[in-house]
């Protein structure tokens, strides 16, 4: 009833120059679709800094479905 031990296959050795070429081709000819990257790129084009998570301009409750309101953020202590 015991299963035979799986046969371990040896991988061929990888050369350092092969890795360098592969890393360069990973994102070549592909558009980056990250939202963070898009926001950073837009801010760079406008000449302003990207929004920070430590900025008080955001309340932390913003989501894709529910945008921040114009009213000031509510305090958790008040």
Curated annotation (Swiss-Prot):
Residue ranges of the region described as Disordered: 1-33, 45-78
Annotated tissue distribution: Predominantly expressed in heart and skeletal muscle. Detected in skeletal muscle satellite cells where expression increases with cell proliferation.
Comp. bias (Basic and acidic residues): 64-78
Ranges spanned by the short sequence motif Nuclear localization signal, renumbered to the chain: 6-14
Signal sequence range: none
UniProt KW keywords: Myogenesis, Nucleus
Name this polypeptide is given: Musculoskeletal embryonic nuclear protein 1
Species per Swiss-Prot/TrEMBL record: Gallus gallus
Phylogenetic classification of the source organism: Eukaryota, Metazoa, Chordata, Craniata, Vertebrata
Gene that this sequence comes from: MUSTN1
């Amino acid at each position: 009833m015991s299963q035979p031990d799986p046969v371990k296959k040896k991988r061929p050795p990888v050369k350092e120059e092969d890795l360098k070429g592969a890393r360069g081709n990973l994102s070549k000819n592909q558009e980056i679709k990250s939202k963070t990257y898009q926001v950073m790129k837009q801010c760079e084009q406008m000449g302003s800094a990207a929004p920070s998570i430590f900025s008080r301009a955001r309340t932390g409750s913003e989501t894709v479905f529910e945008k921040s309101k114009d009213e000031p953020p509510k305090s958790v202590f008040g």
